[in-house]
């Protein structure tokens, strides 16, 4: 059985923290957006914009120094949109063990757009 490969992997830094000293949720959302775009481009090499983030759930905090993995899975491909599920796992290196913990999950809807920014069919032509 092959091990899952993250769409993106990020080491979070002091600039990413909130007033509590954990990683700001908006930073995680930004990386979820990027990871979903990477997945969508693997499915069909187009230009995409984010239409919606659904069912975002923060399970655990992300700590300074965590290595954060963003795993993606295509859920649905429509005429002009792709829905991607993103599962976020932190590798906890503060204790020196590298324990992996599920911290966040979300579903992202991306729409393929042409040069004019209007929706275009995913399966036709280039973006």
Regions found by a protein language model. Name each.
Residues 3-8, 63-64, 75-127:
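HotDog/MaoC-like acyl-thioester-processing domains
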Residues 1-52, 111-127:
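Hot-dog-fold acyl-thioester-processing enzymes
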Residues 53-61:
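Short, charge-patterned binding micro-sites
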């Amino acid at each position: 059985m092959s091990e899952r490969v993250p769409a993106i992997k990020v080491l979070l830094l002091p600039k990413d923290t909130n007033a509590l000293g954990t990683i700001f949720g908006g930073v995680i959302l930004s990386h979820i957006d990027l990871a979903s775009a990477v997945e969508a481009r693997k499915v069909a090499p187009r230009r995409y914009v984010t239409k919606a983030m659904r069912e975002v759930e923060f399970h655990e905090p992300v700590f300074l120094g965590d290595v954060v993995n963003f795993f993606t899975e295509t859920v649905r491909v429509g005429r002009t949109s792709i829905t991607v599920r993103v599962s976020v796992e932190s590798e906890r290196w503060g204790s020196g063990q590298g324990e992996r913990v599920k911290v966040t999950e979300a579903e992202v809807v991306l729409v393929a757009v042409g040069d004019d920014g209007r929706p275009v069919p995913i399966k036709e032509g280039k973006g």
